[in-house]
Design a protein with these regions (language model features):
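Non-catalytic interaction-recognition regions
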Residues: 1-215
Length: 215
């Protein structure tokens, strides 16, 4: 490998990638070239975005579709254990709900939306309730997840950690007011949302996946 820092890289083997219909095969026409595969996922992402946001212009749709489709492909591969056969279902991989890259991206975009125009100030963690602390505990686990992923050469540990953080954050947000909370509690929860956003962004970055501000 002739590129900068190649000596610090470690090859991580991946087993077969299969479609839901079965193993890819040139005889059956199920053998897919990556460039064609990427175009197909991109096209599907564009159609899904158009269903949700009919007011977006084509340039913005394409920009978001590119980020989402690449996240869907990368995350679906990286969340798997080493040497495990990967079943790639484009509809499942592109969902904004479930164990997908777009789901984690959407949690990051939601954090950005909450924080837009808001200012975080000094806060008191004593005001937190159970769901607030669930998020705090998840954030605290990030350094260990990254360290273990590096030691064991398992990016899946980071991917699955991000899924758990996104789920924990979404549960917290569904049960608690943030922007409409009392001032002191609002400041505390805004700081919490800021921390979640930063960890999601850092984690996605380690996996080579963009963290969009909007979805």
């Amino acid at each position: 490998m002739n590129f900068k820092n190649s000596k610090n890289c470690f090859y991580i083997p991946v087993s077969e990638v299969r479609l839901p219909t079965g193993k890819m095969s040139s005889r059956t026409g199920e053998n897919i070239v990556y460039s064609d595969f990427k175009k197909e996922i991109m096209g599907y992402a564009i159609s899904e975005i158009k269903k949700r946001y009919d007011s977006l212009n084509n340039k913005e749709i394409e920009k978001r579709a590119r980020m989402i489709s690449i996240a869907a492909i990368k995350f679906n591969m990286l969340k798997q254990d080493l040497n495990k056969v990967i079943i790639f279902d484009k509809k499942e991989a592109l969902r904004f709900e479930g164990d997908t890259g777009p789901y984690v991206q959407y949690a990051h975009a939601r954090c950005c939306s909450i924080l837009k125009g808001a200012k975080t100030e000094k806060f008191n963690m004593d005001l937190f309730n159970g769901t607030d602390y669930s998020v705090v505990k998840m954030i605290e686990q990030f350094p260990k997840a990254v360290e273990k992923a590096g030691e064991e050469h398992k990016p899946s540990l980071i991917a699955n950690y991000l899924l758990e953080l996104a789920k924990t954050f979404n549960e917290f947000y569904a049960k608690n007011q943030v922007l409409k909370a009392e001032d002191k509690l609002r400041n505390a929860r805004l700081a919490l949302v800021f921390s979640v956003r930063q960890v999601l962004r850092n984690g996605l970055g380690l996996l080579g996946i963009d963290a969009p501000n909007e979805m």
